């Protein structure tokens, strides 16, 4: 393998230690950071994500609250619970694990979270503020990717960056953060005519579509930085990303593995956002 591995586990460990230190300082002043996580239904993947988030809180000195509801929970009941958490001074961050059951409007649920507690960064107030470069919170996955660029000293100013994927959770905010950092950004997606023509010119490629082998070695410029946000399963049932790791790692300059790349960073930045919310609340108290 010629590419330098961007180790999300190692970087997460460093950033979580910093978050734990900040959490301890707040707790000493009577403002222990608190995160509420709401899980509706029994999606197995969601259960794993929620368990990992709660464990990260416990390991780093945060107060955490897990609300578990059956898939039959009504939308008004969920909105009422969010209202209670909005008013709870012990809770600084509220996260509703997606996806939600079909009868619940996820947009309405996200908009019900107070913007100052929207640690996922999905509320329209935070999404809009991201356009101005002044959000209260940056969405956790793109924020984590930016921390990777910073830690590995990947130059962004003037770089050609391609983001594959246009979701509100990763693709769009990722493109905005890269733009803010001075990169020239292209967003590609399922309707893009010649994906390879775009990626071959890119100094940075972020793959975030949830489709195996969407990026192969022949599509990558030698020495490029490749960030794999995808979470898929291969034919053997093993976790894999959107990038053909074996091939692309022979061409790229830097690459993230799956697992052990972007995944741990997402939860780490959730802790960082919760700390920032708690620090703001403490300053206003």
From Swiss-Prot:
GO biological process: L-histidine biosynthetic process; methionine biosynthetic process; purine nucleotide biosynthetic process; tetrahydrofolate interconversion
Swiss-Prot/TrEMBL keywords: Amino-acid biosynthesis, Histidine biosynthesis, Hydrolase, Methionine biosynthesis, Multifunctional enzyme, NADP, One-carbon metabolism, Oxidoreductase, Purine biosynthesis
Residues reported to bind NADP(+): 165-167, 190
Record-linked NCBIfam families: PRK10792.1, PRK14186.1, PRK14189.1
Family membership noted in the UniProt record: Belongs to the tetrahydrofolate dehydrogenase/cyclohydrolase family.
Subunit structure: Homodimer.
Record-given protein name: Bifunctional protein FolD
Organism: Burkholderia thailandensis (strain ATCC 700388 / DSM 13276 / CCUG 48851 / CIP 106301 / E264)
């Amino acid at each position: 393998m010629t590419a330098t591995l961007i180790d999300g586990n190692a970087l997460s460990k460093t950033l979580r230690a910093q978050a734990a230190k900040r959490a301890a300082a707040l707790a000493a002043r009577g403002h222990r950071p608190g995160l509420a996580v709401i899980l509706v239904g029994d999606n197995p993947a969601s259960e794993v994500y929620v368990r990992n988030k709660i464990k990260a809180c416990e390991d780093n000195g945060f107060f955490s609250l897990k609300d578990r509801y059956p898939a039959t929970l009504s939308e008004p009941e969920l909105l009422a619970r969010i209202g209670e958490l909005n008013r709870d001074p012990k809770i600084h961050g509220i996260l509703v694990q997606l996806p939600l059951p079909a009868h619940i409007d996820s947009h309405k649920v996200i908009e019900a979270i107070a913007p100052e507690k929207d640690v996922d960064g999905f509320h329209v107030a935070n999404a809009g503020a991201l356009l101005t470069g002044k959000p209260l919170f940056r969405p956790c996955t793109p924020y984590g990717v930016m921390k990777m660029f910073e830690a590995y000293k990947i130059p962004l100013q003037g770089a050609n960056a391609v983001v594959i994927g246009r979701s509100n959770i990763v693709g769009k905010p990722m493109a905005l953060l890269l733009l803010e950092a001075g990169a020239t950004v292209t967003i590609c997606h399922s309707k893009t005519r010649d994906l390879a023509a775009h990626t071959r010119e890119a100094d940075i490629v972020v793959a975030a579509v949830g489709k195996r082998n969407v990026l192969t070695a022949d599509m990558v410029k030698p020495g490029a930085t490749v960030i794999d946000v995808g979470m898929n399963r291969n034919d053997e049932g093993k976790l894999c990303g959107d990038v053909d790791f074996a091939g692309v790692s022979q061409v790229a300059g830097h690459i993230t593995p799956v697992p052990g790349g972007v995944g741990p960073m997402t939860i780490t930045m959730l802790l960082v956002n919760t700390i920032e919310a708690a620090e703001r609340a403490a300053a206003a108290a």
